[in-house]
């Protein structure tokens, strides 16, 4: 917020902040002149580069530079494109990869009806995918969560503006289950070919196992059982998507593509 971080007395800064919070619309209207027409990132501020690098380290827990992370991203995009090309050939699609993307995004076979009934079908099929993987978890993991996992549609009061599919933790003692929430206000935004991977990412063996087992640890300080690092949590989610394939999931090649 422009103008708040200054050399002023802390009590005066607090007073300025309280005024701005009491009249947020007025503040934002007056602050428009400090906003560039084109977003240019943190580097335009004093100390911006240092701040950006600190955030990179916070999210990645590494000393990788922005250029190194960008190059890693390009390498991964190339690898994933090659995998997707193989699936395109497997299903016999006659066209390039971009045309295949368009086909999957527009063909009605990949979508449930945009109705409450269609949303319930999405929930039930997600439960089936998780039931399939849950049967195989003991063969791959020596420790399983105490808390059960349930699948729910995001509640109507927060569905319109809420986040996409996400996970909400249960309790460490297992008395309340973890919840995989599916955001289904617009079924055209939730294609069938992506739902299996999302179920494994958010549920098992993904965030439900990752967060639940961490919460249950009694050999570390409690604050460490609640700490979260994006590179680990989302890395585990992506690993879980791949592990599910090794466990026999994605029998439909379109789900593998998703």
Question: Where are each of the predicted segments found?
Answer:
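N-terminal maturation segment of proteins
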Residues: 1-258
């Amino acid at each position: 917020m422009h103008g708040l971080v200054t050399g002023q007395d802390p009590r005066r800064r607090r007073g300025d902040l309280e005024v701005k919070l009491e009249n947020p619309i007025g503040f934002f209207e007056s602050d428009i002149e400090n906003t560039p027409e084109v977003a240019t990132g943190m580097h335009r501020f004093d100390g911006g580069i240092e701040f950006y690098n600190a955030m990179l380290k916070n999210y990645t827990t590494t000393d990788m530079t922005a250029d190194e992370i960008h190059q890693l991203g390009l390498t991964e995009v190339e690898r994933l494109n090659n995998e997707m090309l193989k699936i395109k050939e497997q299903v016999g699609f006659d066209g390039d990869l971009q045309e295949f993307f368009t086909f999957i995004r527009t063909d009605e076979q990949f979508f449930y009806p945009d109705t409450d009934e269609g949303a319930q079908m999405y929930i039930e099929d997600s439960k089936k995918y998780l039931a399939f993987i849950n049967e195989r978890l003991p063969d791959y993991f020596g420790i399983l969560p105490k808390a059960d996992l349930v699948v729910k549609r995001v509640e109507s009061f927060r569905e319109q503006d809420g986040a996409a599919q996400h996970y909400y933790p249960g309790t460490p003692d297992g008395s309340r289950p973890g919840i995989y929430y599916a955001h289904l206000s617009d079924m055209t935004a939730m294609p069938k070919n992506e739902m299996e991977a999302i179920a494994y990412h958010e549920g098992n063996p993904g965030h439900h196992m990752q967060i639940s087992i961490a919460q249950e640890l009694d050999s570390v300080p409690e604050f460490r059982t609640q700490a979260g690092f994006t590179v680990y949590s989302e890395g585990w989610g992506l690993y879980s998507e791949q592990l599910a394939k090794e466990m026999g999931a994605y029998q439909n090649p379109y789900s593998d593509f998703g």
